[in-house]
A protein has these predicted regions:
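Generic transmembrane alpha-helix signature in multi-pass membrane proteins
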Residues: 38, 115-121, 147-154, 167, ...
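Helix-coil boundary and interhelical linker segments in multi-pass alpha-helical membrane proteins
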Residues: 25-31, 58-75, 116-132, 181-189
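A cytosolic-side transmembrane-helix exit/cap motif
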Residues: 69-76, 121-130, 148-159, 207-221
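Mid-bilayer segments of alpha-helical transmembrane spans in multi-pass integral membrane proteins
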Residues: 111-120, 129-150, 172
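Cytoplasmic-side transmembrane-helix entry/capping segments in multi-pass membrane proteins
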Residues: 99-111
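Alpha-helical transmembrane segments of multi-pass membrane proteins
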Residues: 81-91, 136-147, 198-204
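C-terminal ends of transmembrane helices
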Residues: 86-99, 148-155
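Cysteine-centered motifs
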Residues: 19-21
């Protein structure tokens, strides 16, 4: 009788342990997904803020970065990201300069967002990393296109105040989104979903922006004869 009771308790303990492991696995996956989504989506807005914030959170808030993102904790990486963010912070507040900055960063933010997402899933199967790479690039593309299209609209205003306000709002959104990804992942999912809806609404302007980028690249590679 005692042996049966002991076996029953052992079985219950095993089931509890299995359930606990599954719950922990789900929570870890959600955390990884949130950081991957947050890092890639924010990269389309401010890549350097995304990298610097994640690195600083890991250093000072004991945030465990998933996969191979621990490379962001390097003081060299953090220092370079902060320095570039300072440059971007200034450039982003100047009309016309901000649009030129966005054109150049079309070739930086989107690939970087894809790499950050794939790196976050570094402990997963290679196929999962490829999927994360593709989806991360798509998220960075959507947020970058929305940012650039919004700036093109704002720059039509003759006064600089609106441009500065929009830029500061983007800075706050970038940092807050990374904080949500780290500590409140479900809210981050809602923010990204809202961002995708906004991207869909301004899709025609996003297409116009990327056509402009293509024309600029063609003009640079094939300058008109003088």
């Amino acid at each position: 009788m005692l042996e049966q009771f002991a076996e029953l308790n052992l079985l219950r303990t095993d089931r509890t342990s299995i359930c606990a492991c599954r719950i922990m696995g789900v929570m870890n996956f959600i955390q990884t997904l949130a950081i991957a989504m947050g890092a890639s989506w924010v990269s389309g807005i401010s890549l350097y803020a995304s990298v610097a914030t994640l690195g600083l959170l890991s250093r000072f808030a004991n945030l465990q970065l998933p996969g191979e993102l621990h490379v962001l904790t390097s003081w060299w990486v953090i220092g370079v990201a902060v320095a570039l963010y300072v440059v971007e912070f200034v450039a982003d507040k100047i009309p016309v300069v901000d649009s030129a900055w966005d054109v150049v960063h079309t070739f930086i933010r989107i690939p970087a967002g894809a790499v950050l997402a794939a790196t976050a899933f570094g402990d997963f199967d290679k196929s999962v990393q490829v999927i994360a790479f593709l989806l991360g690039g798509g998220l960075a593309l959507s947020s970058h296109g929305t940012k650039a299209a919004t700036r093109a609209i704002v720059n039509t205003s003759p006064e600089p105040v609106s441009n500065i306000v929009v830029s500061l709002s983007e800075d706050v959104l970038a940092v807050v989104s990374i904080l949500l990804a780290a500590f409140l992942p479900l809210l981050l999912f809602l923010v990204v979903a809202a961002g995708l809806i906004v991207s869909a609404l301004v899709l025609p302007r996003i297409f116009r922006f990327f056509r402009q980028v293509c024309r600029s690249v063609r003009g640079f590679l094939n300058p008109a004869p003088s």
